[in-house]
Every structure is written in structure tokens, then in C-alpha cells.
From Swiss-Prot:
Skewed-composition ranges (Polar residues): 625-638
GO cellular component: nuclear body; RecQ family helicase-topoisomerase III complex
Annotated protein name in UniProt: RecQ-mediated genome instability protein 1
Subunit text: Component of the RMI complex, containing at least TOP3A and RMI1.
Bias type Low complexity, positions: 24-41
Native organism: Oryza sativa subsp. japonica (Rice)
Assigned protein family: Belongs to the RMI1 family.
Gene3D superfamilies given in the database record: RecQ-mediated genome instability protein Rmi1, C-terminal domain (2.40.50.770)
Gene Ontology MF terms: nucleotide binding
Biased composition range(s): Pro residues: 126-157, 165-175, 184-196
Chain's gene name: RMI1
């Protein structure tokens, strides 16, 4: 039998309805059974495949649509109105066409292999098909399957007997398919009521509490209830079952339902379709995601409205189910704490997905600390500023966010190869607190864990161990020619040895821009200094004084030579594993070089961190704490190359370093913001992306970019003069040229394309400024590329780190993922 569909078309030009009436008369027998279900196919009903009210299906209520009007009643054609069937609504004509040329999208899902109509009215008593397949009836509750070991005729009346009693109960069963009678596609019948579940083996009061909570839609594990009762003082004396249940419920709000929930959802809820769960059902929301936004904007606050669609990941402790915000729910927030609890009643299910509307959900509150911390790490990773086109550990953003939320171990968050980089020192996309003292303290806290990995093992860890090494050097490393001097000379030598070790320590720490034990070393150095100076002042022997001066200069030479050798770091084996080997190697060089190195003795007692930028408001912001003058004259290959090139910034004036780091500038600005109006510094970095570029509204250039120098990623404002010099026009002239048209407009577009290309590929030195009036750094100068002197300086640092084998743990230079 060929299937026929009823199609209604309007014909305003027809003179009479004879043809249409004949067609209607002919189609009456074929369309009589399909008229009740016609709106679900053509979209006249609810439009989502639901049966019409005339069809006694298992679902009693249609799913409410938020935007469509109420469903119109289906068009029915009876035998009494065959003559008037052509007059329907505004001269509509009933035409019967065959299904060979017309295809519908929704018919494909429910096609019937036998050729009959796929919509069949369910009879009052559902009976199994003539060959009753036993697997198709397995979901139906049977009294006992033991009397019928094989599928024979006796089980048929046994199954048919309880069916009339179950017909009033709505079951979320899918439409019957003759081609797929397997039980796997049939969802579970109705949700199991709490009273039908077996009661756990609990004590008398706790059993009553468990039954009371089940009546509210909450099932908890017995061991959790017992631990809760044991942890609450005076639990059994609260005065009744309701009071004890309330106290357990309060504790449950701040617990993880994945560990304490016993499951309240029916089995196989994820495979249900066209079903309604009455509830109440208490669930936990582990995560909320805004599906209407891209990944980088998915974890940002968005108000409830037609443009927002939230996806909720929920659990009852046993099963995980997902819900979709079908209509705006004002009580739900994108950034709600993870692990809060909700109650759901009368929720509709489509393809295993809960369709959430304001009427079916109620927020109970609560939070799970572990889930919330993981979610905060994920949000921090997703909301980081863009990194440009550099590799991100070979992982996409979604995978890196997952690793950030649940790191495998404590070191995974600091490993750049794993892609998880949440604990790094990267600011938020909207840095508005650069000048706060709290920000400076945060930078200091972030710096502290890095110090232990950056200072090499050759640097003595604390003052006590350093003092012990100095005494051993004093007893073993004195030249034999100096043994004739008195006790004062020996004390002075110890002082000079201390100065040498502190110089070596300071040189290694300067290259890492951090000093881990300056506070511990300074008091000890001062103590030795005061003691040795008093010894020198009490001495009256002129020869002893001369030898003291000689040894002081010699040891300063040891310090300078050691620092130069550490800077070059070509041979890793040169640096010994302890101070004894280092001093024995350097003493031979020192005895020949002490005269030329005597000029280095002025700066040996200070332990400073070179910042490389001007905190005293110099015009170009390069500070006075750069490389030392003797460093370039004694170092071999690399430093000789620097001498031959000659850089006006790094080798003139007060011998500044070529560039500094944003990380250091932020730390220093947090300390000096109350005393100086601004600070400036040069960095070596690149522009990762452009955040905003406007010129029409305010008739002036507003260009915000993200810059990265390897230590920090921050938003920065580009000076308007730089933009105007690059484009060659003011903002007003640019707007007028773009709106004029003609050749001028084409030329301006080429200029803008060139400026865009410059920003995308920029990498060089940037002069930035931090002041009180701006919440973000200001770019004052931009010079693409770098000089050869800067490259040599950077190469020296890289060779220093690689020679010691610490590149893998060097988080200070690799803080961006």
C-alpha cells in the first residue's frame, strides 16, 4: 500500500471547489488515520515531533514553546463534510499527492519499511506483536521469569495481564518502530519513585532521615549519612527527624555529590526521548558553559536573554546528565560557583537532554571547593590574553584549559611542554590595578618560588654554609708567600675571600635578575666587615698593612675574573661543584691579573638587582644599574665582540643594559608609585595581537595592543603620535579620506594594510612607561629589530643558562604558555 500525505495549498484563482472536493473525497479514507498526527509532521502542532492531543501517547503534556503561538487544531475531514471539504480557510484546496516526489525532513527519522503510515493510534490495551520477541518486553516488570525459561506461549498472557493497570501511568517510550524492536533503543519506563528503592541498612534515626530526604528528591549514601551524623555534635539530640534531616541537608550543600550521592535519576536517563520526569530531583551542577559564545568568551559573565544559551553538566552521584537553557533563566549565572545544588520538577527530555525553563528549576545554593578551584584555573587559562602565533605546547586551547583545571601533578602547571600554564605570572585581559601595592606584593609572591630554580648550585644557599666554606678556603688556599704575615693579615684575607664569594654570588644572581639569599648574606657580611675592619685598625705593622692591601686587590681580581668567566659560561665544567675547586682554579689567574683588576674594588660590598630601566626619570628610561665597566674588557669571545661593535646605550654613560623586563618594571612601580610620577624602561618584545583600534568616535587614535617580552603579557596603549607618524594622517583626516571615495580612499586603504602588517610582524625594542594616570603601560617608542650589541648580550645570557643545564626549569624566561 502506497503512503499518501495530505497537503493543503491555497488557490485564490479557482472559480469553484469541485476539483478540490473530489480530491478531498478521494483522500478521506487514506487521511483519516493520519489526521490526528498530521500537525507533528508538518509543523502545525508543537513543531518538534510531539503527538497531537488526539493521539493517546505516553506523554500527557506537550513541551511549551517559548516563541511560537499555541498549536492550532489539526484539520480533520469527515464523511459528512465531503461536499464542503474544498472550503477550508481562505479558499484552501485539499490536494492528494503521492510521496514519491515530495520529501520531508522529519519523515526520514520515522520512515516505515512496510509502507504503512508511521503514526498509528495506540489501542486501549497494548498487546505484543504476533511473534512476541522476549527482548522487547524485558523493560516491562514481570512477576517472576523463573517459570518460563524459554519464550513460549504462556508468557504472553502474563505480560498482557498487568498492562491495563499500567496504562494510566505515562511512560517515556519512543514511537514504536517495526524495524528496530531491540530493547536498547527503548528508554526506561518512568522514574523510580524514592519509596520504591530499597532502604539501606542504617540505624533507626538515620533510616528515618534517609526516607525523609528521599521524599524531597535526595538520595545519599549510607556511609556519608553516618559520617555526617558522627561529625555533627549533638546530632541525635536535635529534636526530631525533620531537624536531623535539615542539618544533613545543610552539610550536603557544601559536599561533593559525586562522592555522597546515591542516585535519584532513573536508569538510562541519558537515552530517553520525549519523556517527562515529575521529580523532585536534587542534582549538583558541576559546570556551566555559555554555548552561544566562542571559546575565548565562553567563561565571561552574560546576562540572561535570548542571545544566551547555557549548558549545565549535572550529576546525582551515579549518572551524569546535561541540561540546556531552553528559555532565559535569570537565577542562573555563567560564573556561578561550581558544585551548587538545584531541584528539578516536571522537566522535559529531548534526546537525553534536559530542557530547562524557569518553571522547572530551583536554585538551592552551595559550593564544592575542589570543583570551584579547578573551574577558576580553567577560567584563568581561557581568559588569558592571546599569545600570537607561537606554539602552545602542541595543544589546542581546550586541551590546555583541561590540563590547567586538573593538573596531573604540582609540576605540570609550570611545564611549558605540557601546555598547562595557569600559575604563571600573566595578568588578566583588563589590567586595571597596575599601581596597587597589592599587585606588587602579588608579583613578589610569584617571584619567590622561581628563585630556587634560577640560582645555580654553585651559589651557596645560606650564610652559615658560606661562612664554613670561607674558613676552609682561608686555611687551605692561602699562598705560601703570605704565611709570614701576622693575624691581622689572616683576618684581612678572610675578609677578602668573603668579598670574592659574595662577588661570585652576586654575578650569578645578576644574570638571573633575582637574588635568593640577599637578606641572609647581608647581615653576615656586615658582621665580618666590622670585625675585620677593627682588626685592621688595631694593627701597627706597616708590612702587614701593605700585604693586606695587596690581598684585597688580589681577591677583588678573583671576584671580577670569576664573574667574567661565569658570564661567558662556554665550558660548563669550569664551574666546580663546590667553592674549593672554583677558588683553586681561579687563584692562578688572579696572581697575574691583580694589578689590572684593582679598579673593580669599589662595588664589592653591595648586593643589588640590576633593573635595567630608569627609576630616576631619565629621558629614555635606561637605568644606571647595568653591566660593569671591567666586564667588557676581561671577558673572552662574546665580550670582545661587544667591544668591537660599541653600542651607545649599553656601553656609554653609566654602562646601562640594553633592555629590561616588564616583570621587573611592575615590581618596581609597585614600590615607587607613591614617590615618583612615572618610570620608563626599554623591553625587547613583540605585539601578540591588537585589542582595539578606534579613531572615528573621538577623532583621535586609540590603539590598544598586547605586548609580550617573555616574562609578562600585558595590555598597552600605543602613543597617538606613533600611530599618526606611521599612518601619516591625523584621525580626522583619515576619517575624511575613507569617506571621500576615489583614489584617495584606495591609497588610505593600502596605508592601513601596511600599518596592520607592521603590527602583526613587529618584534623589537619598545620603550614603555608606567604612570599614575594610566591603568595600563604606555608605549612611547617602537623600534623594529635589534642591534648586534643587544643580540650579543642576549646570547651571553642564553649561553650562561644552557651551559649550566637549567634551561628546562627556567620559568622566568618562559612564563607564557
Amino acid at each position: 500500500m502506497r503512503r499518501r500525505n495530505l497537503i493543503i495549498t491555497s488557490d485564490s484563482d479557482s472559480d469553484d471547489g469541485g476539483g478540490g472536493g473530489g480530491a478531498a473525497t478521494a483522500s478521506t479514507p487514506a487521511s483519516a488515520s493520519a489526521s490526528a498526527s498530521f500537525p507533528s509532521v508538518s509543523g502545525g502542532g508543537c513543531g518538534d515531533g510531539w503527538p497531537s492531543p488526539q493521539n493517546p501517547r505516553s506523554v500527557p503534556v506537550q513541551f511549551p514553546s517559548p516563541s511560537s503561538p499555541p498549536p492550532s487544531p489539526p484539520i480533520e475531514i469527515s464523511d459528512e463534510e465531503e461536499a464542503e471539504a474544498e472550503v477550508v480557510v481562505e479558499e484552501e484546496e485539499v490536494v492528494v499527492v503521492e510521496d514519491e516526489e515530495e520529501e520531508y525532513e522529519e519523515v526520514e527519522e520515522i520512515e516505515d519499511p512496510d509502507g504503512d503510515s508511521p503514526f498509528v493510534d495506540a489501542p486501549e490495551h497494548i498487546s505484543p506483536p504476533p511473534p512476541p520477541p522476549p527482548p522487547a518486553r524485558t523493560p516491562m516488570p514481570t512477576p517472576t521469569p523463573t517459570p518460563t525459561p524459554t519464550p513460549t506461549r504462556p508468557p504472553v498472557p502474563v505480560w498482557a495481564a498487568p498492562l491495563p493497570a499500567r496504562t494510566p501511568t505515562p511512560t517515556p517510550s519512543a514511537p514504536p518502530r517495526a524495524a528496530a524492536p531491540s530493547p536498547a533503543g527503548t528508554p526506561s519506563p518512568s522514574p523510580i519513585p524514592p519509596s520504591s528503592t530499597p532502604v539501606s541498612a542504617l540505624s533507626g534515626p538515620l533510616r528515618q532521615v534517609d526516607e525523609f530526604l528521599r521524599g524531597l528528591g535526595l538520595r545519599l549514601r549510607p556511609e556519608w549519612l553516618e559520617s555526617c551524623a558522627a561529625g555533627v555534635p549533638g546530632f541525635y539530640g536535635l529534636g526530631g527527624v525533620e531537624a536531623m534531616a535539615r542539618r544533613c541537608f545543610e552539610q550536603f550543600l557544601f559536599a561533593d555529590m559525586n562522592a555522597c550521592g546515591a542516585g535519584v535519576l532513573p536508569e538510562g536517563v541519558g537515552s530517553m526521548h520525549n519523556a517527562v520526569l515529575d521529580g523532585p530531583l536534587v542534582l549538583q551542577v558541576d559546570e556551566i558553559v555559555n554555548l552561544s559564545a566562542p571559546l575565548r568568551e565562553r567563561y565571561r559573565d552574560a546576562h540572561a536573554g535570548p542571545k544566551r544559551c547555557l549548558k549545565l553538566s549535572m550529576t546525582d552521584g551515579i549518572q551524569r546528565i546535561y541540561g540546556m537553557e531552553y528559555r532565559p533563566i535569570k537565577d542562573l549565572e555563567v560564573l556561578a560557583p561550581a558544585g551548587f545544588k538545584i531541584v528539578i520538577r516536571n522537566v522535559h527530555i529531548r534526546r537525553g537532554l534536559f530542557m530547562l525553563v524557569p518553571e522547572v528549576i530551583e536554585i538551592l545554593g552551595g559550593v564544592d571547593d575542589e570543583l570551584d578551584e579547578a573551574r577558576n584555573r580553567l577560567v584563568s587559562e581561557v581568559n588569558k590574553p592571546p599569545r600570537g602565533k607561537r606554539k602552545q605546547g602542541g595543544l589546542p586551547l581546550s586541551s590546555r584549559a583541561t590540563l590547567a583545571a586538573w593538573p596531573t601533578n604540582a609540576n605540570a602547571t609550570n611545564d611549558a611542554e605540557q601546555g598547562a600554564s595557569v600559575p604563571r605570572t600573566v595578568n588578566t585581559p583588563h589590567p586595571t590595578r597596575l599601581g596597587n601595592a597589592s599587585h606588587a606584593s602579588q608579583v613578589g609572591r610569584t617571584t619567590q618560588p622561581m628563585v630556587d630554580n634560577l640560582i645555580p648550585h654553585v651559589v651557596v644557599s645560606n650564610a652559615q654554609e658560606q661562612s664554613r666554606h670561607i674558613q676552609e678556603i682561608t686555611m687551605q688556599g692561602q699562598p705560601t708567600s703570605l704565611n709570614r704575615h701576622n693575624k691581622e693579615a689572616s683576618a684581612s684575607y678572610r675578609y677578602n675571600a668573603q668579598c670574592s664569594i659574595s662577588g661570585t654570588t652576586r654575578a650569578m644572581a645578576d644574570e638571573h635578575v633575582l637574588v635568593s639569599n640577599a637578606q641572609e648574606q647581608s647581615p653576615h657580611i656586615q658582621e665580618i666587615t666590622m670585625q675585620d675592619q677593627s682588626t685592621s685598625l688595631n694593627g701597627r705593622n706597616k708590612e702587614a698593612s701593605a700585604s693586606t692591601s695587596y690581598r684585597y686587590n688580589a681577591q677583588c681580581s678573583i671576584s671580577g675574573t670569576t664573574r667574567a668567566m661565569a658570564d661567558e659560561r662556554v665550558d660548563p665544567s669550569f664551574v666546580g661543584n663546590n667553592v674549593h675547586e672554583q677558588m683553586q682554579r681561579v687563584q692562578g689567574i688572579t696572581m697575574q691579573d691583580h694589578i689590572s683588576a684593582s679598579s673593580e674594588s669599589k662595588r664589592e660590598l653591595s648586593v643589588t638587582t640590576p633593573s635595567g630601566y630608569d627609576s630616576r626619570l631619565a629621558p629614555h628610561g635606561v637605568g644606571n644599574t647595568g653591566t660593569r665597566s671591567g666586564e667588557a674588557t676581561r671577558s673572552s669571545n662574546v665580550d670582545d665582540g661587544i667591544n668591537n661593535i660599541g653600542h651607545p646605550i649599553s656601553l656609554c654613560g653609566e654602562n646601562e643594559k640594553p633592555f629590561t623586563y616588564i616583570f621587573n618594571m611592575l615590581a618596581d612601580w609597585g614600590v615607587q608609585q607613591d614617590t615618583v610620577p612615572y618610570i620608563q624602561g626599554k623591553i625587547k618584545g613583540l605585539i601578540t595581537s591588537v585589542k582595539r583600534f578606534q579613531y572615528k568616535q573621538s577623532m583621535q587614535y586609540d590603539l590598544y595592543v598586547y605586548i609580550d617580552d617573555g616574562s609578562f603579557i600585558t595590555e598597552a596603549f600605543v602613543d597617538r603620535d606613533i600611530v599618526q607618524n606611521m599612518i601619516g594622517l591625523s584621525a580626522e583626516e583619515l576619517a575624511a579620506a575613507l569617506s571621500s571615495g576615489g583614489p584617495a580612499q584606495a591609497n588610505i586603504r593600502k596605508t592601513m594594510k601596511a600599518f596592520e602588517h607592521f603590527l602583526v610582524n613587529f618584534e623589537g625594542t619598545i620603550l614603555i612607561e608606567l604612570n599614575r594616570d594610566s591603568s595600563v603601560p604606555i608605549v612611547r617608542e617602537m623600534n623594529k629589530g635589534c642591534s648586534s650589541s643587544d643580540a650579543w648580550q642576549l646570547l651571553r645570557r642564553v649561553k650562561t643558562f644552557s651551559g649550566q643545564g637549567y634551561m628546562r626549569s627556567l620559568d622566568f624566561m618562559d612564563t607564557t604558555p
